[in-house]
Amino acid sequence: MPKLRSATTTQGRNMAGARALWRATGMKDGDFDKPIIAVVNSFTQFVPGHVHLKDLGQLVAREIEAAGGVAKEFNTIAVDDGIAMGHGGMLYSLPSRELIADSVEYMINAHCADAMVCISNCDKITPGMLMAAMRLNIPVIFVSGGPMEAGKTKLSDQIIKLDLVDAMIMAADPTVSDEDTAAVERSACPTCGSCSGMFTANSMNCLTEALGLSQPGNGSLLATHADREQLFKSAGHRIVELAKRYYEQDDVTALPRSIATRDAFENAIALDIAMGGSTNTVLHLLAIAQEGDVDFTMADIDRMSRRVPQLCKVAPSTQKYHMEDVHRAGGIVAILGELSRAGLLHTDVRNVLGLSLAELIEKYDVALNPSEEVKKFYSAGPGGIPTTKAFSQDCRWPSLDVDRKEGCIRTKENAYSQDGGLAVLAGNLAIDGCIVKTAGVDESILKFEGPAVVFESQDDAVAGILGGKVKAGDVVIVRYEGPKGGPGMQEMLYPTSYLKSMGLGKVCALITDGRFSGGSSGLSIGHVSPEAAAGGNIGLIADGDLISINIPSRTIDIKISDAELATRRAAMEAKGKAAWKPVNRERFVSFALRAYANLATSADKGAVRDRSKLGE
């Protein structure tokens, strides 16, 4: 029988000092034999996805105490990628993932906590906490802050739905008036919660359901809806049950590595492909798998991408549907149900509810004649009132969207595309692969060939696009923006948004060793590996080189000979210390970022630390 980790600090005469300190936090005699459960919150007033979390940690803590545990809350940092976008702040976004994972490990291990509830929401916070959960392998349950309501405004006498990306695109479009731009800015992000489309934050929160580490509705139930309060309350009760299963019954199936197995990771990427999730999820899933010693690689993602159709299309790939519409259609369980019926899931995997995936689908899939309770749960809709408060409204859709032929979520037979929403491409431009969100690519440019226009930084790319340097038919190359070269692997939301603003969204491609916001769409290919700073061929491309992209064939190539590539490589290596570095890029890189870059791997490895440099 495993001993409570916390016994190290709560038991024995020699721990009198530690117990004295625990008593100063509010613990009493009867508490020292109970599991100490960390409530890992991520409240901050900087991020709309986290601004409403301040009191929710204590909501969970009260439920933990009522269920027989001892709750202790701490906070992690949280970076808002949208606010950090387009300037030096974005260099810090991806590195914050590692910092979050480390900070959770530090707090949990320093204080010998027995289990944890992770209250996450936005882009790097959920993956950072997931990395920590797999690293620590103690009982855990995730509950996110929930998605934002979609924005709505009236333009040209028509009510339109919109989000953050629309504000960015319209702001750079000279044909949009100042008045309309201001109206969009004021309406795009109306409530607390993670941005309303299938961007990175919501994609990751949805994937926690597929991994088995959160409850149904975690990824889709609106932050503002009263129903979400129950997810937090039940998380408090369930974590005590999980802790008791492990520490009192020696049940290792309560641990995250027993739940988030290789089969669960395959289910998660199947879901990601089916729902057209953010390309960042690939980066994060690879990193999370490595933390849990799960054998899951780009090859697995490539294999799954060739089998799984796209069953759901949400903003930014369409403005018709946002996360509130996904929930109305049955949420993530509904997509998993369609994947299961298509024979594309491992349904014997378990979850934090103690159910198999098959049992979960049977109970919660709205397509299977569910209970009135389940129907009511998925009828939760937007309130339409700007607010920063959680659980502030109880509005409901008059009916569920169970149209699997033309609705938000579809069957395999009625899929938006039989070729899924993500694809792995490889060739001499990206020997170790790269990622494209095919859900956001117009059919007319699934095959594309054009001359390269090379930029050594995102800043130069933005200036070049807005300055008219990029023409229809060009392939924009943005390099030295990878994990090591940036450092920090910046998101390229501004370049992709400005291509649209300039009317080039469907007639140009953009390729980078950086990454893309979940809000990006178009022929945007990222995560090129190896990155330029690691000696990747993307660093050898010259202006005018013909670039060939073939998504159906999964290829991406520089149309020059191997001999020419070898000549260019030799010339690069001859530069000595200046080799594989950007030319004439002015960028301040802090000591903290340089330390991150020194250990960072390329995107095909999840941009995690290079363990070989640490003697492993």
Swiss-Prot record:
Pathway: Amino-acid biosynthesis; L-isoleucine biosynthesis; L-isoleucine from 2-oxobutanoate: step 3/4; Amino-acid biosynthesis; L-valine biosynthesis; L-valine from pyruvate: step 3/4. Its EC number is 4.2.1.9. Keywords: 2Fe-2S, Amino-acid biosynthesis, Branched-chain amino acid biosynthesis, Iron, Iron-sulfur, Lyase, Magnesium, Metal-binding. SUPFAM superfamilies: IlvD/EDD N-terminal domain-like (SSF143975), LeuD/IlvD-like (SSF52016). The lineage of its organism: Bacteria, Pseudomonadati, Pseudomonadota, Gammaproteobacteria, Aeromonadales. This is Dihydroxy-acid dehydratase. Its cofactor is [2Fe-2S] cluster; Mg(2+). It catalyses: (2R)-2,3-dihydroxy-3-methylbutanoate = 3-methyl-2-oxobutanoate + H2O; (2R,3R)-2,3-dihydroxy-3-methylpentanoate = (S)-3-methyl-2-oxopentanoate + H2O. The active site is at S517 (proton acceptor). It comes from Tolumonas auensis (strain DSM 9187 / NBRC 110442 / TA 4). One of its GO terms (cellular component) is cytosol.
